[in-house]
């Protein structure tokens, strides 16, 4: 009787091991080659999490990925050099034959299509985190589809007003393709919401015309919330420094893009800063939060689409542009640092860097 029980036990163990071996063989046999293309530099702080989330999300969807990653480093190169780098890189991996390309953010998505490498027309491509998709360029590639992270400036403006009261919100712009679209979209959205937008308005008072009345007026809370779009060029930079200082109340920064000209604005500001995009939120740039497509949502959406394509759905069967889901997302550390009343946060808000002890206080009484 004992011998028979032992025999059954060994048979069960053997069958279990065979099942694991078979599953392992199937997974290794179905390995998919996926190229991931990022816009920014390789040491951008969020990419470590981003790349981990991509792999984990694909594996949860039954995809066993073999991943290669290319970092465009868009801040270091002008457009022609970016396109050449992209073309040469695609040449170098052509023999690897990727099954699918995942590309993130505006610069990499545009450059990938604009370089016109033959590979781009034959491999399914899924983009994510794109604020301003180039529809004319997309129309040339039926195999490209993805997710439009359309910035919602008005909701973010109203969020700042809700948390901090009537304010002047300043945004920084340059003359790039993305900057032109930011400015046009901002004006369009604010016009519909009856929010005044000023361009290049200097809000500090030069010493030669300063009077006590003018200075006192500049320190008062405004009667309504407005937006001031400030160029990051020439003499306007002194205004930016003034806005960042603690000497002028009721003026707050709203991040609309990530590039070298504006990268450290929130970090060095003496007042709370907010964001309409997910870049840098929850990391080192002292951003309180905003109404955005979170990094997690960005990865989930794009890898969902990628998995469907790899499992047999034609890439042409999806709409080329799908709007991304948005949430209120805040960095708990910055909310606490700036002493923002947590009761004012939207009830469905996502809190990054929320400590376990704060989440379950009764465990630490």
Predicted regions and their residues:
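Short hydrophobic alpha-helices and adjacent helix-cap/hinge residues
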Residues: 2-6, 25-365
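Bacterial N-terminal signal peptides
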Residues: 12-22
């Amino acid at each position: 009787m004992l011998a028979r029980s032992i025999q059954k036990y060994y048979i069960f163990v053997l069958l279990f091991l065979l099942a694991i071996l078979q599953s392992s063989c199937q997974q290794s046999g179905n390995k998919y080659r996926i190229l991931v293309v990022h816009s920014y530099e390789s040491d951008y702080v969020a990419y470590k999490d981003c790349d981990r989330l991509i792999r984990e999300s694909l594996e949860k969807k039954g995809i066993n990925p073999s991943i290669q990653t290319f970092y465009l480093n868009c801040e270091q190169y002008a457009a022609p050099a970016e396109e050449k780098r992209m073309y040469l890189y695609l040449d170098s991996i052509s023999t690897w034959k990727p099954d699918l390309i995942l590309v993130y953010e505006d610069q990499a998505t545009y450059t990938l299509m604009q370089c016109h490498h033959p590979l781009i027309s034959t491999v399914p491509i899924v983009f994510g985190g794109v604020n301003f998709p180039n529809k004319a360029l997309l129309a040339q590639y039926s195999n490209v589809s993805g997710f439009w992270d359309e910035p919602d400036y008005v909701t973010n403006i109203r969020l700042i007003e809700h948390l901090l009261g009537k304010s002047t919100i300043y945004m920084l712009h340059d003359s790039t393709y993305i900057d032109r679209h930011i400015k046009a979209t901002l004006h369009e959205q604010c016009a519909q919401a009856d929010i005044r937008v000023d361009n290049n308005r200097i809000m500090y008072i030069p010493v030669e015309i300063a009077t006590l009345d003018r200075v006192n007026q500049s320190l008062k809370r405004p009667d309504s919330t407005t937006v001031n779009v400030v160029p990051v060029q020439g003499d306007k930079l002194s205004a930016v420094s003034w806005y960042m200082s603690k000497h002028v109340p009721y003026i707050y920064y709203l991040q609309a893009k990530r590039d070298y000209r504006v990268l450290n604005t929130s970090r060095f500001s003496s007042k709370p800063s907010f964001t309409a995009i997910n870049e840098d939120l929850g990391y080192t740039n002292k951003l309180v939060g905003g109404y955005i497509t979170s990094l997690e949502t960005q990865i989930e959406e794009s890898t969902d689409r990628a998995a469907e394509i790899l499992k047999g759905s034609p890439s042409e069967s999806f709409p080329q542009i799908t709007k991304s889901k948005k949430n209120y997302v805040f960095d708990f550390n910055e909310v606490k640092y700036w002493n923002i009343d947590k009761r004012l946060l939207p009830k469905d808000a996502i809190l990054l860097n929320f400590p376990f002890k704060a989440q379950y206080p009764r465990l630490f009484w």
